[in-house]
Structures are given as C-alpha cells and as structure tokens.
Amino acid sequence: MNNPWLVISIGAILLFIMLILYFRKSDKNKIKAALTVGILLTVFDFILENIGKITGFWESFHGLIYIAYVPIEIFIICFFGGVMWSLILPSKRDDKFSVLFILLSIISATFLESKLVDIGLFGYGNGWTTFHALVAYSIIIFLMHETFYFSYAKFSKDKFNWLSPP
C-alpha cells in the first residue's frame, strides 16, 4: 500500500468495527449519538477543508479520489474517527473526565496533524501554523462533545429514531 491515507482509513474502519461490536448490545442511544457526531464532523470538515484550500491556509495531498478539494480518505477518517471518539465518552456527563478527555483530544489531534504536515500529506500556507490548528481543534472537539450529549439526551428522552423512516 503506497497511500498512507488509505492505511489510516482502513485503520479507522477496523477500530470502528471493533468498538461497534463492543457496544452493540449496550445503549443504542449512545451509538445513535455517536453516529450523529460522526456525520457532523464529516460535514464540518468537508466545509473547512474546502475553505482552507480556497483561501490557501491548508491543503491535503496525495488522496486517491477528491470530492471538491477533500480526499475521500478524510471523509472516512472523520466519520469513523468521530464515532469512535464519541463512544469513549460516558453516557452521563462527567465534567472531570470531559475536561481531561477534551484536552487530550486537542493535543493529540494537533500533534497528529503536525505529523501529517511533516510527512507531506498536509500543508499549511498564508501564515497558518500549528497554533492555529490547536485553536481550531479546541473549537471542533468542544462542539463534538456538546453534540454528543445533546444528541444522546434527545435520543434518550424522545425515543426519536432517526435511522428509521417515520
């Protein structure tokens, strides 16, 4: 496999399968909320990736297939990564866990992106730096966290099943 994006995507899918198998008999509302976060992250990232490319702030390189300016592998990573990230959250809010988990996630995401820059899969321009990425990840990860708990509360309270037709 010559494409690192593909390797990362396959890894994300395999981890996703393992977590879904682990959680399949537990709280279905947690899985629905996690899927919501995965979809949100994928859409949000698609918009941001395109804005970044158009403005010259950042760009992804060496994708197999591009949708607008975004490699298909990034869609896969965002969706499955967002779901996996959400499944780690406890069903009931735990502020201490959340603060530590959010901080660890921000640091990890920023570090991993800096490594993507180092190996040539991602690039910055027009003054964008790793610090800017840190701030962006802080906002995105906080939104993912809040989306998970908002969605979980909605699915638990209303018994709304968005996976089934009305």
Spans of features found by a protein language model:
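Aromatic-rich, lipid-facing transmembrane alpha helices and their immediate juxtamembrane interface loops
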Residues: 1-166
